[in-house]
């Protein structure tokens, strides 16, 4: 099994010509991406590399002066972006309400829903190891530009640990943030295949807002990771964002862009810390179980207005990504299970009833057997139960609705 991570390296220049060369190369690469994107959009989303090469390669080389490998990279990058958008659209179907009956319906979406080609706004360059970038024995990174290779010094704590022979490097992405330059390098490492027979811990994880995560394990131990501080900070960001949007000035738009980057970096750090805490707590041979949230709506009218936006923008998927790669590096696994009925099912008697959950009190009370507990804990308990079913051999465990035993 391969584990993939992204190594983020800050770059220090040795020549005053490096920054302008990087800037020019990135801008031409961006323009080439938009050129290819227009073609893909207007040709029924053609993704075959051979067809796109035949139609566009010569034009990319001539119009944008990109080297051979960069021209190929442009095509791959555009195709990858469209495929990512296709996946995102499939995960979030269109929901609409029938004005006559009041019932809600879902309709799956695909790329034909796009009204215009995907636009590449941010200048960047995708670089292939060897031909476009390399790391020398003297600690210098060399990066290809339209004016030849540039030499830069990598600044990254623990960067040398990835050169112990166990990691393989692939594509790298050249980026600029403010006045600082970065290289994001894709690295993969072979990890031991996860063995269900060696599992020591099965941990159900319910993700949310009030609690970032609620966990329940095989020892019946529950842990709550408080999200109130995160909610307050996100509400603060939302207030600042609304104030800047109401101004509409150029300076306000610049501040909005910086604010968005700051919020994303902060939230990324929160998810990194939380995923690290979970992996460190349980160690190797742990199965972390998450509910599959594809197509799940988070429209919550019971939340205050200030928190509804947070609910929509919550980075559940990012937390899952971080937890997955950290678990793989620690000989553990993350599995998704069906979210159906996990918040409605009594973990003691198995009866499923929506009204047993009280959102206002954050409580679950089973009318059948009388079991009562925190509603987030109930979710984690049910998710953990599905994890045990997975370990026992059920490939896609889910709950079937039962009526009361009475």
Label every PLM stretch briefly.
Residues 1-406:
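Nucleic-acid substrate recognition interfaces
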